[in-house]
């Protein structure tokens, strides 16, 4: 393949990489962000999304990079989520009077890394993408350098992230040692030929370490320890970003590695994913019961929801991966909207971040209270909100798989949803029935608008959106397994 053909396939990453460098130089002279600077960053992400949609499909650089329907689907969602994060972050910085230009640059660099992982066709490109996004996210977690909790969050994330990278690299080195290649297609060929020999066992041993490293990135139990502390300490706009785009990118990593590199080892890795899925669901459900801080509560909610997405990956095949992609897309909208609403709220200039702070919110800010209620019911899986359809697809895929383990996992997942209902309903009860805790400041218009838009998507827009989201996710799921 010629250089021009390779270049056309990686154009979205090129656009974002060049834009990040230009914005970095621009910011160095300007010293702070501005509406024009923020607009340029958002435009770069939208341009990359368009390039991903209209660009050609194929494999670049001898199979190291895959531009297919799955990558396109994930990149569009990731880039749009990143653009929203930049807009919300710009408003957060403006309120604090500390308009650092690095915020937008870091989000773009994280988006580049996520895009690379979504298109990875090789263990090396996978690792490069993972580390590029992780390094940017470490800095974003500690972006409030004058805040002890933010600095602590960034440090914890960095230290545990280094551990997970070590696990991932160790697994990758074992796989390379037994397969003799880092390309997913070559690993799949070796795995198929040596499924019952020493090489097959060695590959599976490496895969276990690789899954452990990836589980950290997606906050799956038992590698979830960093999530509540990082969510609590990081800025609200950053938390909304953390809970959305990186989660989809991490799920794409799971789908790429398992679907493209280990398609003949489904029986082995399915058991591991089912255990991780159920552990995540029940850790998220039960640990969330004791939380009063909303960021920590939604951290455990995200752990539980990762469990449901992993159930879709464990189901495998086009149906399972289709359910995972739809689940993550709908979940991204809900979690972005919830944290946008949370960012919009303050009392006496201080953020409202606990359930007690939300007491009587419907009397002070009825619109935001209704939106947050919608997001809570959606995360719970209550019909007709988008979260119901997300879980409907995942549980439907598991129950229709014909695998008894997956069917029991789906039943237990429903039990976990019932347990988690308590903390969602506790928040709703505080907003609607408790006495107001005091006057609420005028909300941030941009954050409020994002929250309202996401709430409208959750219902009723989702009913129309699924008409084109469903076939798009199905086409994306069909692309896996063709490394």
From Swiss-Prot:
Its main location: membrane. It is a multi-pass membrane protein. The keyword Transmembrane applies. One of its GO terms (cellular component) is plasma membrane. It catalyses: a quinone + NADH + 5 H(+)(in) = a quinol + NAD(+) + 4 H(+)(out). Keywords: Cell inner membrane, Cell membrane, Membrane, NAD, Quinone, Translocase, Transmembrane, Transmembrane helix, Transport, Ubiquinone. NDH-1 is composed of 14 different subunits. Subunits NuoA, H, J, K, L, M, N constitute the membrane sector of the complex. NDH-1 shuttles electrons from NADH, via FMN and iron-sulfur (Fe-S) centers, to quinones in the respiratory chain. The immediate electron acceptor for the enzyme in this species is believed to be ubiquinone. Couples the redox reaction to proton translocation (for every two electrons transferred, four hydrogen ions are translocated across the cytoplasmic membrane), and thus conserves the redox energy in a proton gradient. This is NADH-quinone oxidoreductase subunit N. It comes from Caulobacter sp. (strain K31). The gene is nuoN.
